[in-house]
């Protein structure tokens, strides 16, 4: 393995250990506590417009809460989820324990996964919800997700913005509090997505919500 590959693998292992340690107990109350400030998730999922019988992957699927919501809106979709935390996937599998449809959940690195790991050639939709702000090498996660799309597929992202339209004191307090949970909103998210869309001849839709509390984006890949 190259030096870069070794360093990346080491960083992934370290991040996995960090996430498992943080979520070993938090996962039991995660959905209850996060619903008050992880805004825009449900509307993003409703707008996924997954084709009938299409494939949907969530990168950083956590407890499976978003997957369950997506299943209610797109009952024929084939669901897949990856997370670097084994602890979170324990909760994800419990979320679907009594349901007829069970997604394929895998422990995987968001920066280095391929559709083949899930037995498919690509995904029609990929969702990254409040995960890029927790992935150290988040640009590579965007790269991997775009590469995993089917022709004409869509990558949907919702995450913390820069609160640019809100009072400075609110932004300062929020970002200091988020840092305690290893969350870092990405100030250059739009620029990175614009560059990626241009490179892949894809269309980018980007919007700010709630004074920049939430940034939401969709990259629509080129049809072959």
Roles of regions detected by a PLM:
Residues 115-126:
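A short acidic, Gly/Pro-enriched loop at the edge of an enzyme's catalytic core
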Residues 124-137:
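A short SAM/SAH-binding and catalytic strip from SAM-dependent methyltransferases
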């Amino acid at each position: 393995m190259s030096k870069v590959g070794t360093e990346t693998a080491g960083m992934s292992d370290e991040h996995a250990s960090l996430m498992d340690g943080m979520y070993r107990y938090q996962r039991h109350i995660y959905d209850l506590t996060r619903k008050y400030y992880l805004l825009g998730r449900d509307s993003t999922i409703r707008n996924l417009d997954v084709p009938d019988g299409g494939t949907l992957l969530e990168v950083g699927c956590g407890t499976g809460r978003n997957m369950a919501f997506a299943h209610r809106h797109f009952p024929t979709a084939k669901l897949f989820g990856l997370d670097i935390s084994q602890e979170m996937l324990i909760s994800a599998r419990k979320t679907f324990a009594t349901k007829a449809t069970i997604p394929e959940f895998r422990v995987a690195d968001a920066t280095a996964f391929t559709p083949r790991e899930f037995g498919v050639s690509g995904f029609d939709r990929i969702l990254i919800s409040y995960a890029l702000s927790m992935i150290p090498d988040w640009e590579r996660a965007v790269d991997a997700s775009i590469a995993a799309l089917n022709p004409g597929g869509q990558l949907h992202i919702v995450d913390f913005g820069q609160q640019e339209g809100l009072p400075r004191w609110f932004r300062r307090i929020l970002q200091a509090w988020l840092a305690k949970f290893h969350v870092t909103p990405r100030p250059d998210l739009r620029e990175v997505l614009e560059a990626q869309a241009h490179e892949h001849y894809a269309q980018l839709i980007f919007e700010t919500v709630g004074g920049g509390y939430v940034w939401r984006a969709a990259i629509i890949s080129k049809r072959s």
